[in-house]
């Protein structure tokens, strides 16, 4: 067997993070599990005792969404969620749009979670009631200060409070079931038949509004860089645990909190009051305390997620680079943190701490994120599926159905919630204008380049899909060296060689064995490899006038050198431009001729192959 065959079959080991299924469940539940504390009250204001009907309607779509988000997690191990999947599946500008959607979602999550946390805390400390608004603003500012100081939550700490809150929620379900008894449970289901008439407009509005009960699902995709291998198995097990927890708690707690309690009960304290009603004040206080702590954690998680989105969009070239600057004192991105905190504070003040108003504003960003993620994943599946067996067709059809159901919910909210449309749409337009303006500003100075995502286990598919028609051998493969002067010499030679044709620029990053990923950080190695960003920017700046078709491929430094050979085999070029020092990264091949040019002390090779083929073993020995 030839050396080339051995290399091509070599298994590439991918180092994962440290989060197993339980810790991933905990972080996701710390976000999505907080919805039960305020969603029943929000739905009750519009739909009264019918609220549980609409939660059940959206529960089916939620389960389908969990399948999609688990796949996004293992397909995109660098994380980034909607920003990453949409930029790679659609276009980098779609990533900007997804970033604005998720920022709207994060802003409202931070505001409504902090506010609800203070409301539940007032159950055990009634003296806080007049100070809820002030306390909420103070808690958001304090969270901002803690993040600037570099004091962040860990997954293990989150797991403690997520488990405590989950135990409290399940305890309320069990206590209420015991309190009602079998006959009472059956009778409670009939309570949903009382209330406003279920006309078509009411059904449509309820379906769109109830998606708020499952906000926070998107956080699983942000955990991918920290997730333990095998990510595919861990992501599905974590999402399975999330589904099980939500199926047990969300519909039943919504049903009983909206049908069993007195009409005079504060809707924003439903779950705590239900626990006290079924099992005594001790359980009610436990739910209030554990819920308020988890809500504050969810608010902090939203702030962390938001400022990491700001940093990712900055590194992609869509926002001013000042947002990425870190202070010398604590090495934290203080400007990005400020950008993540100020608007939730403004929202709390402007709405005067009204949970219902904040809930109405929620739908735009949340459902917009779901829609863009679903469409992107459907396109990725469509491109990668080669054999359309009945099982594959059924699976793909279910994915498309999920997308359609989410689009319908988003359209409903755009129509029936004009305030959310104005608020979310306004922020989205501002974000797009800022992003495109920044991109244009840097275009002639330090242009942003979006390379092909290189995935070791699906290298051929990912590169072939991204390059499309450029896979013709008429194009030149250019391997950029790390040294700047040598890189400029290679770019100059490549621009002349590929003039009027096309070029694929390849850069292999530097290995950082001890690189640390923060929780919810976008772990794309290219965005953190400033040398690669500069190399591609120079290549774009120097070659775009001469080379009409340009593509860029980035190979992370933690992958073996053989991955460069994998790219070469996929691109199948007839000409390769490389320095003499980097020639060893190429696979053994039959070379027709080599031209050598020396520019400013750098020897640049032009290697020509009339037919791409491996050298026999005897020739490589």
Label each PLM-derived region with a short phrase.
Residues 472-526, 604-609:
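Small/aliphatic-rich secondary-structure junction motif
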Residues 91, 238-300, 323-352:
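TM-loop-TM module centered on a large, flexible mid-protein loop between adjacent transmembrane helices
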Residues 10-11, 159-216, 222, 228, ...:
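Helix-loop-helix junctions that connect adjacent transmembrane segments
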Residues 132-182, 238-242, 359-372, 394-406, ...:
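Membrane-interface loop-to-helix entry segments
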């Amino acid at each position: 067997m030839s050396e080339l065959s051995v290399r091509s079959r070599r298994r590439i080991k991918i180092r994962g993070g440290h989060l197993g299924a339980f810790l991933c469940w905990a972080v996701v539940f710390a976000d999505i599990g907080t919805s039960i504390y305020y969603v029943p009250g929000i739905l009750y204001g519009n739909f009264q005792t019918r609220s549980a009907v609409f939660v059940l309607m959206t529960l089916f779509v939620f389960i389908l969404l969990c399948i999609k988000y688990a796949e996004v997690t293992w397909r995109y191990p660098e994380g980034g969620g909607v920003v990453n999947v949409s930029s790679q599946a659609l276009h980098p500008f779609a990533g900007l749009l997804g970033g604005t959607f998720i920022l709207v979602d994060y802003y409202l999550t931070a505001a409504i979670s902090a506010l609800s946390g203070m409301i539940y805390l007032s159950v055990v400390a009634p003296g806080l009631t007049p100070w809820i608004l002030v306390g909420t603003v103070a808690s958001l500012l304090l969270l901002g200060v803690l993040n600037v100081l570099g004091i962040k939550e860990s997954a293990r700490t989150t797991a403690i409070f997520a488990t405590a809150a989950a135990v409290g929620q399940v305890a309320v379900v069990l206590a209420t079931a015991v309190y009602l008894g079998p006959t009472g449970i059956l009778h409670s289901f009939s309570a949903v038949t009382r209330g406003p008439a279920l006309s078509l407009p009411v059904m449509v509005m309820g379906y769109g509004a109830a998606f708020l009960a499952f906000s926070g699902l998107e956080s699983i995709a942000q955990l991918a860089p920290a997730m333990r291998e095998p990510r595919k198995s861990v992501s599905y097990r974590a999402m399975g645990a999330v589904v099980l927890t939500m199926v047990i708690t969300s519909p039943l707690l919504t049903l009983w909190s909206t049908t069993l309690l007195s009409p005079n009960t504060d809707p924003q304290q439903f779950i705590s009051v239900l626990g006290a009603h079924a099992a005594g004040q001790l359980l009610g206080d436990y739910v209030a305390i554990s819920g308020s702590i988890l809500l504050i954690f969810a608010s902090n998680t939203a702030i962390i997620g938001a400022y990491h989105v700001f940093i990712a969009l900055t590194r992609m070239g869509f926002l001013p680079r000042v947002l990425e600057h870190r202070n010398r004192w604590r090495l934290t991105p203080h400007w990005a943190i400020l950008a993540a905190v100020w608007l939730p504070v403004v929202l709390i003040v402007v709405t005067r701490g009204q949970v219902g108003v904040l809930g109405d504003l929620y739908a735009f960003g949340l459902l917009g994120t779901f829609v863009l993620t679903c469409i992107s994943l459907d396109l990725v599946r469509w491109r990668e599926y080669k054999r359309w067996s009945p099982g594959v067709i059924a699976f793909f059809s279910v994915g498309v159905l999920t997308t359609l159901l989410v689009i319908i919910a988003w359209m409903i909210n755009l129509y029936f919630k004009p305030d959310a449309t104005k608020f979310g749409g306004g922020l989205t337009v501002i974000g797009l204008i800022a992003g495109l303006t920044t991109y244009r500003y840097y275009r002639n100075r330090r242009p942003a380049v979006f390379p092909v995502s290189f995935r070791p286990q699906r290298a051929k598919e990912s590169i072939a899909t991204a390059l499309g028609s450029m896979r013709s051998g008429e194009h030149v493969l250019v391997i950029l060296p790390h040294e700047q002067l040598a890189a400029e010499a290679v770019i100059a030679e490549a621009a002349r060689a590929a003039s009027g044709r096309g070029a694929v620029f390849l850069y292999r990053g530097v290995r950082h064995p001890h690189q640390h990923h923060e929780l919810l950080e976008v772990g794309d190695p290219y965005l953190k490899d400033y040398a690669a960003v500069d190399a591609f920017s120079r290549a774009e700046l120097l070659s775009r006038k001469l080379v009409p078709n340009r593509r860029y491929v980035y190979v992370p430094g933690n992958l073996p050198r053989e991955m460069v050979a994998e790219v070469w085999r996929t691109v199948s070029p007839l000409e390769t431009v490389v320095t003499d020092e980097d020639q060893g990264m190429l696979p053994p091949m039959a070379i027709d001729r080599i031209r050598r040019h020396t520019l400013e002390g750098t020897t640049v090779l032009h290697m020509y192959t009339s037919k791409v083929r491996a050298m026999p073993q005897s020739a490589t020995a």
